[in-house]
Structures are given as structure tokens and as C-alpha cells.
Amino acid sequence: MRRIKANRWVVLAVLFLFSLLHQADRLLIGPLTTSIMNAFNINEAQMGAALSGALLVGGVLFPVWGYLFDRYSRPRLIALAAAIWGATTWFSAISPSYGWFVTTRASTGVDDASYPGVYSLLADYFLPRIRGRIYALLKLAIPLGYILGATLATILGTRLGWRNVFRFTGASGLILAILILIFVRDVPRGATEPGFKDLIEIKGARFSWTTARGLLKRKTLVALYAQGFFAVFPINVVTFWLFRYLEVERGYEGGFLLGIMAITVLSLGAGLQVGGALGDWLFQKNLRGGRLLAGAGTIIGVVLLIMALFTSRENALMFSILVAVGAFFAAFVSPNVGATISDISLPEVRSTSLAIQSLIETTGTALAPLVARLLAARSDLRTAFIIIIVCATVLWLPCYGIALANVSSDVEQTRAELLSRKDHY
């Protein structure tokens, strides 16, 4: 256990760097879209196909990665994911034609589905009482990666061209693969769970299909899987279409527009940290605490975002404040849901459980912008935002209620089963 304590912060730092640079690589294609379209002389529909390919491949492979992470060495698989990221991004950089580019960009989705293993490994390095904060810190890589990707695309893209930007981020993936192999070590699954944390040596539990199928018998998990589909709609619709909404329907431009985007992204990052910390604190007081906090944050965020949409174009300051604060509260959900899934899932199937959640959320993430575009075609983006936010919340709340009603007993059941194994090690 002493070795785990000594190494865990180094492991977290390396995995955070992996997540940060990987998210930057995933998100910088947005700012580089125009340059890529000009290079291959393609239209928006063709570019959309290139973007959708990676999402589709990643979604299909979530269960595969989850299974592999539960069966084999997690650090080696994460290093493999980093190497795949580097290689596929490099191939994208040297694509001679549009067809080749679509294929290579789709292949970048292979490594996008590797995050369940990252969270599973960290769950075995850090105690349950601080899992929310650890997950929140790792998820901070998403908004920071967005900023880093935009910065790289703006600074390097204009000077070096989009191909060299991809070469740079591809090389980063290969370097990260080496760092992961050097600094990250696997630990026994369940090493930090109550009843096991004081043991020096633990024989890891083995994956079994019976245990994996048992995930669907936990009411809390099923409810969290279902809510994950609806919960991602509002934040992904707003994130995907916010720039165009601000530019076209509200008439904002230049530095002010970029300022709103930056503040919103930073608010998301801050909300992740506060939500994770408060969720951990309440979880120690009451097993339902983290979930209560996540639900409250989502509801507050929804109300504030809708209020922002009803502000006048001239009241830009109030609009900016409401969007930023709404994003802050909406971010409370993510680390708490992830921590709850980890607390309920047995260690030997934790990656599989997280992969199921990721698959469902990815499906919602892919559909949300399309639904918004279809609604906007009949009215406008503002109306589409309001309809999607309200409908998603109405569908999400019952799932939240079911999870809230069962989370305490499900966590206690998992802990009891783990304690019953203690005498066997």
C-alpha cells in the first residue's frame, strides 16, 4: 500500500497529461476545419463524414476496450491507446486524398474509447472518499484540451499548416506511450476498497461474464446508464452550436464572442473541481450525498441556461453571466456520476461498467447536434436549445430518482461482497 501511495500522484500526473494532449488532438480539428476543407476541396457534408467516423468507431469499441481493461494490464493497454493515437494522427497528417483522410480520421476513434481503463486504474490508486475529486481533475483535461487545441490550431495552424499540427500532436501520443510504460504500473483491482486498503498484497479478482452481466441487475447502474443518454444532450448541443448561435442569432463577434466562449469553458472546468470536491464530502456524510449534489447542480444549470436564452441581445453581460454560471453548475454531474459507478461496480468489471456508460453517453453526444440542427431548420437555434434542454431534463429526472432511491443499498451491497472476499486473500 505504501508503494501505491508513493506512486499514485505520479501516475495521476502522467494520465492527466495523456488526457490533456489527447483531448487537444481530438478537438483541434474544429478550428482546422476550413484549412482541411480547402486542402481537399470538399464541402461541409463531406467534412462532417470525416468527423463522424471517429465518433462511430470509438462508440463501437467502448465495450471491447472495457473487456480488455478488465482482463489485462491496464497501463500497457493505455500505452497502446496512446501509440494508436500518435500513429493514426500522423497518418492523417500525410493523407494524400480525401478518402485516405476519412479513413485515417475514423481510425483515430480506436483510442478514443480507452478512457474507461484510465478511470478504472485511478479508482484502484485512490480511496473512494476522494474519487470524485480525482475524476474531476482528470475531466479538467476536456475544457483545458479545448483551449489548448484552439491555441495550437490558431498559432501553429496559420504558420505551419494543419498537416504539421497533426504531426506535432501525433508525436505527442507516441511520447506519452513511452512515458506511460515507464511511470505507470498496474495495481490489484480493488486495492483501495474498504476492507482491502490496509493489506500489502492482494490477489486481484478475475473478470467473469457472470459478474459483468450482474451489472445490469443493479438498479442504480441501469438508471445511471439511462440518464447518461439524456444528460449529455443539453451540454453537447450548447457546446456544439454555441459559437454559431452567438455569431448569427445574437450578433456577437470578435473578441467579445471569444471571451464568452473562454469564460464558459473555464466555468465548466471550475464546476468540475467544485462538484467533485463537494460530492466527495457529502458522500462521506451520506452515501446518497454525491448523487444529491449532482442532481442539484444539473437542475440549477438547466434553469440558468434557459434564463440566458430569454435575455435580450442587448443585455450581453447578463447573458454571459448566466451561461457561465449555468455551465459551472451543470459540470457538477460528471465526476459524481463516474465516482458512483466506480463505487457500485465490482473492481474486476469496473472498466466494463464505465465503458457501458461511455457508449451510451457517446450515442447521445452524437445525436444531440443533429437533433438541434433539425429543430433549428424549422425555427431557430434558440428554440432548438430550449426544446432540447427542457425535454432532456424531463426525461432525465425519473432516472435520477431511481438512482437516488437505490444508490445507498447498491454501494453497501458491493462493499459487503468485497469484505466477504477478504478472508480469501
Model feature map: region roles:
Residues 104-143:
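Cytoplasmic helix-loop-helix junction between adjacent transmembrane helices
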Residues 291-336:
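C-terminal transmembrane helical hairpin of 12-TM major facilitator-type secondary transporters
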Residues 29-30, 219-273, 334, 338:
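Extracytoplasmic gate region of multi-pass secondary transporters
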Residues 52-65, 262-275:
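Central cavity-lining transmembrane alpha-helices of secondary-active solute carriers
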Residues 76-90, 290-305:
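Structural signature of the two symmetry-related core transmembrane helices
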Residues 60-98:
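Conserved MFS/SLC helix-loop-helix module at the cytosolic interface between two early adjacent transmembrane helices
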Residues 185-210, 410-420:
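Flexible cytoplasmic inter-helical loops of multi-pass small-molecule transporters
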Residues 138-186:
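Helix-loop-helix hairpin linking two adjacent transmembrane segments in secondary transporters
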